[in-house]
Amino acid sequence: MAKNKDVRVTITLECTNNCAQNNEKKKLGVSRYTTQKNRRNTPTRLELKKFCSYCNKHTIHKEIKK
């Protein structure tokens, strides 16, 4: 039997804005999304513009290591 490498992997996207360090907001935390990507089509780290509930605006979310 041949080894089957996972082509589609589950990744985590994290907000790049400093939501946790912003003292003006009442909510403190980090916005994270989980999604899947195809390793063959996108070998580099993924960056998507998603809504951050802590910043209350659309910000860039980058792929993080697990």
From Swiss-Prot:
Keywords for this protein: Chloroplast, Plastid, Ribonucleoprotein, Ribosomal protein
Any one of the GO BP annotations: translation
GO molecular function: structural constituent of ribosome
Pfam family, any one: Ribosomal_L33
Subcellular location: Plastid, Chloroplast
InterPro entries: Ribosomal_bL33, Ribosomal_bL33_CS, Ribosomal_bL33_sf, Ribosomal_zn-bd
GO cellular component term of the entry, any: chloroplast
Chief localization: plastid
Family the entry assigns: Belongs to the bacterial ribosomal protein bL33 family.
Record-given protein name: Large ribosomal subunit protein bL33c
Name of the coding gene: rpl33
